């Protein structure tokens, strides 16, 4: 079982009580993606395995013995899981995860981040170029992904879905999960129509702590 990026949010007790090895992945040190509380879980689960972006160690949010740290281009692999670190257009990394015959991608802060109402044309072109370069690298390894978790953040302005649109146009996705929208569920779920037009199943999120079972992909 994997638990990715943790904020002050909700991890139901049953997740910590489920059998099997527990993996916790954190993509970078920003507080909406990393919370030191996750390190306390090892008291309940001595078998827990932490896979963190190396910037978390650099910024002294955790110590060297707390986790396995990886950078873009690194791979963590054991008898259960394979995790490849890809790039970000902010800090840290994104995760490509192969687990039990399924392939998952967690974008971290990888996105086409620009504020079209505020950014200059040059800034917009650079943001888009940097983003598409990272997507091309991922596409070479993973032209198709079963589950993608990707930012759909209306706080960046009217073109906030552009990065998500470009992503699903380039990589075949079975299930798309919006994220990074804070409490703006309507804004995150607004991507549903476009995702479904590209053949994705879209998971609409209604509240914090909502869970989904995905037995058949």
State where each predicted segment sits.
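Nucleotide/phosphate-binding catalytic cleft detector across ATP-hydrolyzing
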Residues: 1
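Binuclear metal-ion centers of metallo-dependent hydrolases, dominated by the metallo-beta-lactamase
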Residues: 61-76, 156, 160-217
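Active-site neighborhood of phospho(di)ester-bond hydrolases with catalytic His/Asp-centered motifs
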Residues: 4, 20-32, 50-55, 105-108, ...
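Structured loop/turn residues at beta-strand edges in well-structured enzyme cores
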Residues: 19-20, 45, 81, 129, ...
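Metallo-beta-lactamase
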Residues: 50-104, 203-216
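Active-site HxH/HxHxD metal-binding segment of metal-dependent hydrolases
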Residues: 14-75
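Pre-active-site segment of Zn-dependent metallo-hydrolases
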Residues: 4-29, 33-41, 110-141
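Active-site-proximal loop/helix segments of hydrolase catalytic cores
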Residues: 89-169
